[in-house]
Amino acid sequence: MATAKTIDLTGKAVGEVELPAVFDADYRPDLIKKAVLAAQANRLQPYGPRLYSGMETSARGWGSGRGVSHVPRLVNSSRAARVPHAKGGRRAHPPKPEADRSEKVNTKERRYAIRSAIAATTDPTLVSLRGHIFEAELPIVAVNDLESLERTKQVIEFLEAAGLYEDVLRAKYGRHIRAGRGKLRGRKYKHKKSVLIVAGENTPILKAARNLSGVDVVTVDSLNAELLAPGTHAGRLTVWTESAIGKLEGAFQ
């Protein structure tokens, strides 16, 4: 069974911990992508136009004999209305609010995707390909004292000592305005993901680190493929606590 060094809050190695079998899972980018896309699809809200959008007009057709197309026209005007190719008219085939856009993933596939994404966090090549900046040896396992940190300043000091804070700064200054119409729809900026911190239990670290740019903090029970592989790309820079490593034993089987 593979082992990993354990670091304290100053970034120094203080021991070793045996890694559970989940870290030996095969890399399956196809299953990871399938699980992440399903999670994103299942968050979608129903959307579509109002039932009478583009139809609320008194337009009517002129009929034959005028040498013009047979389209509804506004009263006392020759301007076309209501039809899809007219300004302000209805859409031809709009999205239907009643459509089922959810996606299903087999339970065994979903669990295997999580195991594969967990194993990918130990591969320096995959982590580097995601753009993460780090100096520490992977996987990064911290002592349980990390879970008791209550202030964001303390978390920053730990990340600096572990050689991970540069990645947080990369996410902080990497925010940029998105291209396209999404700017008008409540998603003006695109944000980068940085460090994922996984704790064993619901401890103070979950609140202390959550306001750092790009940082996500979760318990083992809340892990999913999207947290481990944002945008379907596996190899997220992840910090595990000793208790989290212990809870991974036999998990997601």
Swiss-Prot record:
GO terms for biological process: translation. Residues 78-107 are annotated as: Disordered. InterPro entries: Ribosomal_uL4, Ribosomal_uL4_dom_sf, Ribosomal_uL4_euk/arc_CS, Ribosomal_uL4_euk/arch, Ribosomall_uL4-arc. One of its GO terms (molecular function) is structural constituent of ribosome. Keywords: Ribonucleoprotein, Ribosomal protein, RNA-binding, rRNA-binding. One of its GO terms (cellular component) is cytosolic large ribosomal subunit. Residues 95-107 have a biased composition (Basic and acidic residues). It comes from the Archaea. Transmembrane segments: none annotated. Residues 82-94 have a biased composition (Basic residues). One of the primary rRNA binding proteins, this protein initially binds near the 5'-end of the 23S rRNA. It is important during the early stages of 50S assembly. It makes multiple contacts with different domains of the 23S rRNA in the assembled 50S subunit and ribosome. Part of the 50S ribosomal subunit. Belongs to the universal ribosomal protein uL4 family. This is Large ribosomal subunit protein uL4. The lineage of its organism: Archaea, Methanobacteriati, Methanobacteriota, Stenosarchaea group, Methanomicrobia. The gene is rpl4.
